[in-house]
From Swiss-Prot:
Cofactor comment: Binds 2 heme b groups non-covalently.
Protein encoded by which gene: MT-CYB
Gene3D superfamilies linked: Cytochrome Bc1 Complex, Chain C (1.20.810.10)
Protein name per its UniProtKB record: Cytochrome b
Major localization listed first in the record, in broad terms: mitochondrion
UniProtKB keywords: Electron transport, Heme, Iron, Membrane, Metal-binding, Mitochondrion, Mitochondrion inner membrane, Respiratory chain, Transmembrane, Transmembrane helix, Transport, Ubiquinone
PANTHER family: CYTOCHROME B (PTHR19271:SF16)
Length: 379
């Protein structure tokens, strides 16, 4: 008799994806972040669902409903902080996951990579709208500044912004629709993640060498299930340390002040995970130019397969490319730091140099380094 997990229509799908899946024998801990992202998404959906039971998306009561969750709802404070810091963990895993893809050339799986970039945009949109919901000062002004960027689009810009706002400023209509979108998008993300996995399982996983591993596969269970469980335990350890010891470490104190359209905070800035893109936006003195650079800073990932000039897939055996990759990481950390600083000397020039460096590294230096390596290896 066939095992039920191999014959049952539903169990068969789970079996082929998580149990009998042939996986390369040499994938490192950098391959753990996919499963961690899945866990993050589940945590966010569950905590978000419980928050939505007590939250009201009205400008008059939104701020006090969040206060009510923290003070009066049973374990409301832990649910709220798990959701807020869960977003930070989500983005840490996302950046690691994308970085792994860049380093080991995983972007050569075109469909998987493109769905991944769409997922990245969707998660960023969800996080942005979620930040608006508590209706604190930074929520309101962040929403005002970021939505206003669309007014840089020629001809239709102003109409588009007012259409998104549902009025002539960020107000009740904006908050209600942001809540609606923030609620529905995670389920769309979950569906996209399924498609992401579907395409991945068509080709099988990449591995650190970038060489085909068809002749050396091992079953996903028990080897990688146990490895993923270790990753999940470490993720929960870090998340709960944040939540229970320093829940406001990554937040902005301004968001504990209720939104006031008549009073602008001295430094408007988004959450830490958007600071690198915000720094690129601010480094260009022209509004439309800044918006284009902001979009391109993420959209550039789509073009990675076209910019791959090396005869090797992975960077494992390419010291020049490795060096440039880590310079890119340092550059992104610099941009993140600059994004949180006020617009004054010397931060302006540092931000501009780091922004130029970001695009130069990806568009020019890394493809050239790959060609140099090809020549050095006489390929």
């Amino acid at each position: 008799m066939t095992n039920i997990r191999k014959s049952h229509p539903l169990m068969k799908i789970v079996n082929n994806a998580f149990i009998d899946l042939p996986a390369p024998s040499n994938i490192s801990s950098w391959w753990n972040f996919g499963s961690l992202l899945g866990i993050c998404l589940i945590i966010q959906i569950l905590t978000g669902l419980f928050l939505a039971m007590h939250y009201t998306s009205d400008t008059m009561t939104a701020f006090s409903s969040v206060t009510h969750i923290c003070r009066d709802v049973n374990y409301g404070w832990i649910i709220r902080y798990m959701h807020a810091n869960g977003a930070s963990m989500f983005f840490i895993c996302l950046f690691m996951h994308v970085g792994r893809g860049l380093y080991y050339g995983s972007y050569t799986f075109l469909e998987t990579w493109n769905i991944g970039v769409i997922l990245l945009f969707t998660v960023m949109a969800t996080a942005f709208m979620g930040y608006v919901l508590p209706w604190g000062q930074m929520s309101f002004w962040g929403a005002t500044v970021i939505t206003n960027l669309l007014s840089a689009i020629p001809y239709i810009g102003t109409n588009l912004v007012e259409w998104i706002w549902g009025g002539f400023s960020v107000d009740k209509a904006t908050l209600t629709r942001f809540f609606a979108f923030h609620f529905i998008l995670p389920f769309i993300i979950a569906a996209l993640a399924m498609v992401h996995l579907l395409f991945l399982h068509e080709t099988g996983s990449n591995n650190p060498t970038g060489i085909t591993s068809d002749m050396d596969k091992i079953p996903f269970h028990p080897y990688y299930t146990i490895k993923d469980i270790l990753g999940v335990l470490l993720l929960i350890l870090v998340l709960m340390t944040l939540v229970l010891f320093t829940p406001d470490l990554l937040g902005d104190p301004d968001n504990y002040t209720p939104a006031n359209p008549l009073n602008t905070p001295p430094h408007i800035k988004p959450e830490w995970y958007f600071l690198f893109a915000y720094a690129i936006l601010r480094s260009i003195p022209n509004k439309l130019g800044g918006v284009l650079a902001l979009v391109l800073s993420i959209l550039i990932l789509i073009f990675m397969p076209l910019l791959h000039t090396s005869k090797q897939r992975s960077m494992m055996f390419r010291p020049l490319s490795q060096c440039l990759f880590w310079i890119l990481v340092a550059d992104l950390l610099t941009l993140t730091w600059i994004g949180g600083q006020p617009v004054e000397h010397p931060y302006i020039i540092i931000g501009q140099l780091a922004s130029i460096m970001y695009f130069l590294l990806i568009l020019v230096m890394m493809p050239v380094a790959s060609m140099v390596e090809n020549n050095l290896l006489k390929w």
